[in-house]
């Protein structure tokens, strides 16, 4: 899915054409773009919701499996081979979790940042588990306006998903400065509309921390921990508690 520029996806198209039977591009901008290649193109108006255009794109798919990638991502040869192996490995699996490795500037400090094997000069990253490889099945679809997910639909349909060793390289965090406030507003809206979803407080906390709203981030993780009492919220809550102290009492 891209906004209004076809160029960023050309490298993705080139990298996957050896294993993909079809390529579908969803364009959410308000103008036509210069297209190239043998891709199916869907123009879909943007309305502050990532799931809806992605689901519209899924309806164009005819292949048995879907590999979903964004314009600020890439997949290397090693992981393409892992994708090829995964789709032929098990008949009882409907989807695979991958590692979305989001690279960051070396001095960036926030929850989840760690050292990773060097890739194109970067060793600082956040690893997020998400489902990007899944069967083309009408029971499997994206939900939520931001940090769109397939987990809920898979679980409702009782379809099995498993972890994989597939890594997708993500460069979007390097250029988040202009978009971070917008993503924060989307995360607030998701938490307001879906307070019952376990991940809503988490993504609000992550988005708030990224733009320096430390107190709001802490309160989001704290609210999630009080509600669910699990490690998913306890660990980032403790991280933000320490970060609050390091601000010498300054509250954002």
Segments (PLM) and residue ranges:
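Conserved donor nucleotide-binding strand/loop of the catalytic core
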Residues: 35-52, 56, 60
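Catalytic-site signature of metal-activated, phosphate-bearing donor transferases
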Residues: 51-58, 65, 69, 75-216
């Amino acid at each position: 899915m891209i906004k209004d520029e076809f160029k960023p996806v050309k490298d993705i198209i080139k990298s996957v054409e050896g294993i993909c039977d079809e390529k579908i591009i969803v364009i959410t901008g308000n103008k036509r773009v210069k297209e190239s290649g043998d891709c199916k193109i869907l123009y879909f108006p943007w309305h502050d919701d990532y799931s809806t255009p992605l689901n519209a794109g899924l309806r164009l798919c005819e292949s048995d499996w879907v590999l979903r990638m964004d314009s600020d991502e890439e997949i290397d040869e090693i992981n393409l081979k892992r994708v090829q192996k995964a789709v032929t490995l098990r008949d009882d699996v409907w989807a695979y979790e991958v590692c979305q490795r989001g690279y960051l500037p070396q001095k960036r400090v926030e929850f989840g940042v760690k050292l990773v094997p060097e890739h194109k000069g970067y060793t600082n990253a956040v690893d997020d588990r998400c489902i990007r490889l899944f069967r083309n099945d009408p029971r499997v679809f994206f939900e939520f306006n931001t940090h769109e997910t397939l987990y809920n639909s898979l679980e409702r349909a009782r379809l099995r998903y498993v972890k994989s060793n597939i890594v997708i390289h993500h460069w979007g965090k390097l250029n988040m400065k202009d978009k971070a406030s917008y993503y924060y507003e989307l995360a607030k809206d998701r938490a307001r509309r879906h307070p019952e979803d376990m991940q809503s407080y988490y993504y609000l906390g992550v988005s708030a921390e990224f733009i320096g709203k430390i107190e709001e981030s802490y309160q989001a993780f704290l609210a999630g921990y009080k509600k669910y009492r699990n490690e998913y919220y306890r660990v980032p809550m403790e991280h933000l508690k320490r970060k609050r102290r390091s601000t010498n009492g300054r509250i954002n």
